[in-house]
Amino acid sequence: STVSGYTSGGSDTGLSNVIDKFPFSTDANATDVGDLTSTIFRTTGQSSTTHGYSSGGTTHPDGLYTGSADIIDKFPFAADANATDVGDLTVARYFSAGQSSTVSGYTTGGYGTAGLHDVIDKFSFSSDANATDAGDLSVARFIHTGQQY
């Protein structure tokens, strides 16, 4: 969205499922506009022109490399609403990076129960479905950033 920023999930004194929204046009506090399908943190974000996505993460409160998730949650930009689970990543993981093209979301790298991952997962914005393995990073990594051009 070019109108608002969104943030979802995370941790404060516990795990959160909150979807927050704030305007780009003026300096203002965020408001709670919905919930993810689970309390989760260390997720990855992607955006289409109409929806926000949260993928992967961990649902384990100690965050000690357990409880990795394969969830792909989707929520609308047009109306304040809860997210729906629309698919799964090929590998459950967290500390991944997120990228978005005009037609697909990507979740890259990360850490899961099997250790570091190099997988590039791709999921369609036009239909709700599981991600597919679109390739591999040059090295397995986690706690990295994602960009698109």
Question: PLM ranges: what are they?
Answer:
Residues 1-149:
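Polar, enzyme-active/binding microenvironments
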